């Protein structure tokens, strides 16, 4: 109750030491569709739920898993429009790095720069925090990377994690299933099974998306490939 008078101010701390708008942004993430990231020994998997609002909706018109460079990809939980802004910013940051250094941006560098953009929106007047958390997968220096970045601008490296609705169940499932010797194929199955833990209804190739990142680069799996993986775990 003591924080109520501070809930609309982004740049003022409440008496309990919180920026309440960031708490609300994290609530938007926790209410969003589940997303999962798993780092395998030879790559990274991103998977997310993508339920359609209507049977008339063209499911290929908007993707939740997006490539940023040839070797980095991203997914979100939370507010889609905010995510699209960050995708554009991330691509621009990657291009600027390439123009200066004439080499692809390392995954860690991109994560740091995107997180800095998100952090700026927690201490500026006239704006609000981004209502998304990001999972960023990459491959450089001959090894895979997986990071999560939150609305506060905090970022962490993960072996495997889940976010969005029912993220606690997802993380609990991953803690039981994950091991560091996991290979990419097994990681894809594990990611889909993690989504299935909290999935309501029939899971099909049309209502989930999967992306993989390995030494060949980052790509989204086609619906036909996702269908094959779903058949394998049925």
Curated annotation (Swiss-Prot):
Keyword Calcium: no
Residues where N-acetylalanine is found: 2
Keywords of this entry: Acetylation, Cytoplasm, Nucleus, Phosphoprotein, Proteasome
Coiled coil: none
Gene3D superfamilies noted in UniProt: Glutamine Phosphoribosylpyrophosphate, subunit 1, domain 1
Pfam families xref list: Proteasome (PF00227), Proteasome_A_N (PF10584)
Residues annotated with Phosphotyrosine modification: 121
Record localization: Cytoplasm; Nucleus
GO cellular component: cytoplasm; nucleus; proteasome core complex; proteasome core complex, alpha-subunit complex
Superkingdom to which the source organism belongs: Eukaryota
GO biological-process terms attached to the record: ubiquitin-dependent protein catabolic process
Subunit structure: The 26S proteasome consists of a 20S proteasome core and two 19S regulatory subunits. The 20S proteasome core is composed of 28 subunits that are arranged in four stacked rings, resulting in a barrel-shaped structure. The two end rings are each formed by seven alpha subunits, and the two central rings are each formed by seven beta subunits. The catalytic chamber with the active sites is on the inside of the barrel.
Function (record text): The proteasome is a multicatalytic proteinase complex which is characterized by its ability to cleave peptides with Arg, Phe, Tyr, Leu, and Glu adjacent to the leaving group at neutral or slightly basic pH. The proteasome has an ATP-dependent proteolytic activity. PSMA2 may have a potential regulatory effect on another component(s) of the proteasome complex through tyrosine phosphorylation.
Protein family (similarity comment): Belongs to the peptidase T1A family.
Protein name: Proteasome subunit alpha type-2
Organism: Carassius auratus (Goldfish)
Gene that specifies this protein: psma2
